[in-house]
Structure formats: structure tokens, C-alpha cells
Amino acid sequence: LDNVDKITTNAILREQLRLVSIIHDNFKHLEETVRPRQDWTKHHAVYAMKFAQNFIKEHHILNVIELHDEAYYAWHLNRKYPETNRAFHRLNGLFERLGDDYKQLYYLFFKCDTFTGDKTETPVRWFEETVSNIDLAHL
């Protein structure tokens, strides 16, 4: 949660980021491990979102919980298939679900979650270079 305190001074954003941070990866132990993935309803983010629905009513927070890995998946598609638009289609789907009003919240969470010291920061750099209408944040 240190990154949440560093990335913004906005109290509402901090509260939302803390909720997502605490819940988003708690159900990895239930996730289907077969690859390629056979059933996306058994993704840890779906389990986390369903759990969060019991306590959180704000759809934008639930969407960020459920979709928290989408930017990483889009980056991975871009790396694997750079000659196609697959990554951009995935990002467009993400932003259709989130809505423009919550793109910044998603980005801030993605950056907080990635900059924990044990993950490659390249997906966030790609996101920052690719996505328009976000205010870049520094950690």
C-alpha cells in the first residue's frame, strides 16, 4: 500500500486504490492453472470481483478489480504479435468496460501494482506510451 500513498494525494483515489489493492489478488489459489486458459470465469480476478460485490457497490471499483490484469495481457499480446492490432483491441475492450472517467484510476492501480519491486515495469511504460488521456504518475 506504500505505492498508493506515493502515487496520489487525492483522498478518494487513495481509498479506491486501497480497496482494489487489498482484494485484487487474494483468490489466485483458486484460479484454474491449465494453460492456455480454458475458462476465464475461473480467473482469480473474477473470483475477487465476485467476493468484492458483497461489500462494494461502486461498479467502477468492481471493474478495476475484475480487469486489473488486462493491461498486462494487452502488453503481452503486443510483444507476441506486434504486427497485429490484437493488443489495441484488448485495450479498447478494457476502456469500453471502464469508461473514460475511470481510465486514470485503472492506470494508477496498474502502476502501483507493477512497481512493487518484483515485476517488470515494461508493461506500464508501454501503457503510458500507448494510452491517451491519462495523467502520468511518478513513484
Show the residue positions of the predicted features.
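Active-site glycine- and acidic-residue-rich loops that bind
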Residues: D2
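Charged substrate- and nucleic-acid-binding regions of tRNA-handling and nucleotidyl-transfer enzymes
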Residues: D100, Q104-L139
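Divalent metal-dependent catalytic cores for phosphoryl transfer on phosphate-bearing substrates
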Residues: D5-T116
